[in-house]
Amino acid sequence: MLPDKYIQQGSGITYMYFRKFKLRFVDTYKFCLSPLADLRKTYDIKTEKGYFPHHFNLPENQNYVGSYPSIEMYGPKNMSPKANVEFNKWYAEVKNDVFDFKKEFKKYCLLDVELLSKAILTFRQIFQTSKDLDPWRYVTLPSMCKDMFFKKVPS
């Protein structure tokens, strides 16, 4: 099924609407430019982001059950010094446990969805409460701000 409306930006889809289901998809990254781990701090969300060995996510490892993948599989070189310290502490605690790829992948994805859901709901509530404005009526943060400016939404 194809969407009735969509907005494409490069190879990404920013917005999709399915009339039959009254279902709208908006790219939340167009509103919250921070990584998920930072949104957790921004909106005081208790859900932990967790760690996942993205470099280990290869077709041949999809059914892997065994020792935890090496530290390099988690991309520690891409972490901030503070995040790296936290990661190393976590890794020291789990490295001798059994790593079940499917179980860990599912857990990591569910935590991402939970964290993003809480962040965007909090973001929405802040604007609805302070500006009487629903950000999800817009496709991007700049389009919302433009509307606020021209409608002179009270500050």
Question: What are these regions, as identified by a protein language model?
Answer:
Residues 1-155:
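Metal-dependent nucleotidyl/phosphoryl-transfer cores and adjacent nucleic-acid-binding surfaces
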